[in-house]
Each structure stands twice: as C-alpha cells, then as structure tokens.
Amino acid sequence: MEKYIQRIIDIHSRLKSKSLFLFGPRQTGKSSLIANQIQDDVKLSWSLLNARTRRRCQADPGVLRDEIETRGIRDGLVIIDEIQKVPELLDEVHLLIEETDIRFLLTGSSARRLKEQGVNLLGGRAGKMNLHPFVWPEIRELHPTLDKILKYGMIPAV
C-alpha cells in the first residue's frame, strides 16, 4: 500500500458541530482523507459503491433510519460515501439531522449533478467543502519534477 500524503484540508474540525458534504472529482482521495482524518465518533459508515447497500437504499431509503434506530444511534457521526449514487437518501438524512444529534459526512463527486437532479441539499444544515487534487505544499517533500507534474497532474491516484 502506498504512503498516505497528509492533506491541508481539515474536515475533522468542520464536523464538530455540523454535517458536511465533501465534494471533489473522482480519484482526488476523498475516501482516503476520511479514513485518515476521521476515526473517532463514527457510528456508521456506508459506501454506496457496495452494490448490495446501494440496491437496498434505492429500493427503500428508509433503511438508513432503520439501521440507525436498530443500532440505537442518537448522536455521533454517520458517513455515507458516494451519496450521488442514491440521492433519495438525502431526505432521510435531512429528517435525521432535524430529529437527532447525528452529524453526517456525505461524499460525492459532483454537487452540480445533485443540484441538476433537484435533490435535497439539506438547506443549510450541512456545510460544503471541495477536495481538489494535491497542492504544492502537500507534495513538496516528495520532490516531484515539473515534468512529472505536467505529464500526470496532481491527482493522488496517478
């Protein structure tokens, strides 16, 4: 496994009091960032890349509430990775934010795509952050050459 490169963006402090959308292009490291910055306080974590989880949520978005109630979760952090795959879950998230002290971290590749679909973006109940490809201070110690940067860009997966 490759070494994790510490990112400048700090999602942990933003999640102390409010839910958060974390948007960014594919392969910019959203899932890796979460795995490396958010360890404590996570009560439930779903990836909608998991076909079984995605199909259950598409068939009945209420399974999110059922899972939270079954586990007795009333506060803490719930992570839903790739929320754009089942945007119908956002209505459940909205209600759960209103009814509980749960904070949500929702990742996706495109806020624009969600807006175009006319889905609930939680009306101010969640902050928004964008994760971009690496910036120079994050990779300076790796001593990348200008040639490599121009050839491959600064996306973590490359």
What are these regions (language model features)?
Residues 1-158:
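Phosphate-binding site recognition
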